[in-house]
Amino acid sequence: MRAQGIRPAMLIVDTVFSSDGVWPDPAGFLADAAAAIRAEGGLFLADEVQPGFGRLGTSMWGFQRHGVVPDMVSLGKPMGNGYPVAGLVIRPEVIAAFGAQSRYFNTFGGNAVAAAVALAVLDVIRDEGLMENAARTGAVFRDSLAGLA
């Protein structure tokens, strides 16, 4: 890209490549990619729509497996457990720069019902031990598949 005079703006990555059949990549490999995009002046967005909210069983967010803190995190599907809600979490310095350079308005932002649903989902994840259940269930599934190999 540099040879063509193209400056990258952002690296957007599903932190576990969950659309590829949830094939576990080596933990930590995204750290170098995040460092590379930042060295070029770009931002790193961790797409947590699929792996987020404890679905991996080891941490609340897939990016935690890589030892990185993203500039932005996209959230979705499990956030509302079927209710339409999504979110974008942005580092304070990134949103401050955006706000200084752009005017922004969102027609559907700040929906109180959607926010209440998302908070209730967080309570259920914590109170019912869903992350721990994902770890147990995932281990049984992996072990069962290994037995077929």
Give each language-model segment a name:
Residues M1-A149:
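Conserved N-terminal phosphate-binding loop of PLP-dependent enzymes in the Aspartate aminotransferase
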